[in-house]
Amino acid sequence: MPSPMISTDVCQDILGKQKEAVDFFFQAFQPKEAMQLAEKILGHSGWVFFSGVGKSGCVARKLVATLQSLSERALFFSPVDLLHGDLGLVSPGDIVCLFSKSGETQELLDTVPHLKSRRAILVAITSMPYSNLAALSDLVVILPSVAELDPFNLIPTNSTTCQMIFGDFLAMLLFHSRGVSLSTYGKNHPSGQVGMKANGKVKDFMFPKTEVPFCHLGDKVSFSLEVFSAYGCGCVCIVDPQFRLMGIFTDGDLRRSLASYGGEVLSLSLEKVMTANPRCITEDSDIAIALQLMESSSPVAVLPVLDNEENRHVTGLLHMHTLAKAGLL
């Protein structure tokens, strides 16, 4: 029996419907209630609970995981488990956010009287403003109602995408309001590529001083080409006798110099064609800061590394290829 074929027309139709749903979400979403929810969380020292059933529950779990990585006191609860003992976690004033597209999810509605008896603050996150869940809640965040991707409008697809967008929006509101630092996030997320990027220091990834190509101000461009070839870094660092950084001469500088001076460039001193005061970074700086410097509006492939801003002694060289091999790009 032949395998079914994937139709290009079907692919384009699905992608078009996804784009249409996301575009509609951004056009129709009103952030006022989401901002109110963020303010409630910021003013609350207790727990913030999230729940949902089915795919909405998966979205709630993901949001909780993001918030926990930002040091928020967030927990997910199953509505069934809540009624089998987990209510003991809920204290007066705690915030409980319930995800339900329809606002009629019976498992969530069953928890409402018990949560109210604990004097919790109920927040409905729904697409149906006149639903029972919305009517019973203290705050209602309305997500624009979007059609699902299947022809029956039943399979949670576009609706959960919009829930995810809302969840990330809420998390980033809290992130910016709290002023979460790179150090804090790194301590919460020490493993994997994210942990490496958040916690790594420049000195962990740089070429050491012994592997840095050096030249001096009076050296000729012709000599620098020999150094280029010997080290293969695509640049030379120009230093004074104490190895203080004076400038950098890259393969890009060489191309520009050839365009300006032609063959005469080989007899010029590096001082005439180098980039003075190049972008650089100290060895104890966060690798994430170095990446920002390298990937700015005019990207560079290398950064000279200094001991500190005051002495400006070159102690290493940071190369984009090293960061790419480490999976940081």
UniProtKB/Swiss-Prot annotation:
<dbReference type="InterPro" id="IPR046342">
    <property type="entry name" value="CBS_dom_sf"/>
</dbReference>
<keyword id="KW-0677">Repeat</keyword>
<dbReference type="InterPro" id="IPR000644">
    <property type="entry name" value="CBS_dom"/>
</dbReference>
<protein>
    <recommendedName>
        <fullName>Uncharacterized protein CPn_0526/CP_0226/CPj0526/CpB0547</fullName>
    </recommendedName>
</protein>
<dbReference type="InterPro" id="IPR046348">
    <property type="entry name" value="SIS_dom_sf"/>
</dbReference>
<dbReference type="GO" id="GO:0005975">
    <property type="term" value="P:carbohydrate metabolic process"/>
</dbReference>
<dbReference type="GO" id="GO:0005524">
    <property type="term" value="F:ATP binding"/>
</dbReference>
<keyword id="KW-0129">CBS domain</keyword>
<feature type="domain" description="CBS 1">
    <location>
        <begin position="206"/>
        <end position="265"/>
    </location>
</feature>
<feature type="domain" description="CBS 2">
    <location>
        <begin position="274"/>
        <end position="329"/>
    </location>
</feature>
<feature type="binding site">
    <location>
        <begin position="52"/>
        <end position="57"/>
    </location>
    <ligand>
        <name>ATP</name>
    </ligand>
</feature>
<keyword id="KW-0067">ATP-binding</keyword>
<dbReference type="InterPro" id="IPR001347">
    <property type="entry name" value="SIS_dom"/>
</dbReference>
<keyword id="KW-0547">Nucleotide-binding</keyword>
<dbReference type="InterPro" id="IPR035474">
    <property type="entry name" value="SIS_Kpsf"/>
</dbReference>
<dbReference type="InterPro" id="IPR004800">
    <property type="entry name" value="KdsD/KpsF-type"/>
</dbReference>
<dbReference type="GO" id="GO:1901135">
    <property type="term" value="P:carbohydrate derivative metabolic process"/>
</dbReference>
<dbReference type="Pfam" id="PF00571">
    <property type="entry name" value="CBS"/>
</dbReference>
<dbReference type="Pfam" id="PF01380">
    <property type="entry name" value="SIS"/>
</dbReference>
<comment type="similarity">
    <text>Belongs to the SIS family. GutQ/KpsF subfamily.</text>
</comment>
<dbReference type="GO" id="GO:0016853">
    <property type="term" value="F:isomerase activity"/>
</dbReference>
<feature type="domain" description="SIS">
    <location>
        <begin position="37"/>
        <end position="180"/>
    </location>
</feature>
